[in-house]
Amino acid sequence: MKWTFENAKIKGRIVLTDSLHEDPDLLKDKTLYKFIWVDSGEVELDIDHQHVVLKKGQLVPLSHLHHLEFLRIEGKCYALMFNGNFYCIHGNDHEVSCNGLLFHGSSHVLTFVLSEDERRKIDTLTRIMQEEFLSTDQLQDEMLRVLLKRFIIL
């Protein structure tokens, strides 16, 4: 599955997919910030020449500057990606901005272990996002941005 929304006016883009590893064009896009998390099994990644193994319930945030390569996938993982024009240019709070600790706070790859409650919330948010990607009303852009902000806050 792959859901994409693009706002041509501001050149903003947001993507939710469970097949990033099969999409070379999306993998090569150097404008996208990424959240990758494992729903089941484990995923082996190379992130800026650092070997990372993500297991069920783990999430990694990556900036548009990170180089990402999928080495092995055993299970199911998701990626939520967006460019700076979609989210970062909107002057978001420093707690949820693109320039904060989440994306640029360490020289090491940050890995988060999600609690059962956080996993449930992410699952709920991504289901709502999937519905919003299919919507074509005038509020779609803003709704996806609000859902992304909520995802970041989690």
Where are these regions (language model features)?
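Conserved metal-binding segment of the jelly-roll/cupin
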Residues: 54-67, 81-82
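Generic protein-terminus/edge-of-domain signal
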Residues: 1-55
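Short beta-strand His + acidic residue motifs that chelate non-heme Fe in jelly-roll/DSBH
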Residues: 44-46, 62, 67-73
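A hydrophobic/aromatic-rich effector-binding and dimerization subdomain
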Residues: 2-8, 71-131
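An amphipathic alpha-helical interaction segment
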Residues: 117-154
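Short, surface-exposed beta-strand-loop junctions and turns on beta-sheet-rich folds
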Residues: 51-53, 60, 76-77, 86
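Amphipathic alpha-helical recognition patches that constitute DNA-binding helices
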Residues: 34, 113, 143
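Residues embedded in well-ordered beta-strands
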Residues: 34-36, 79, 150
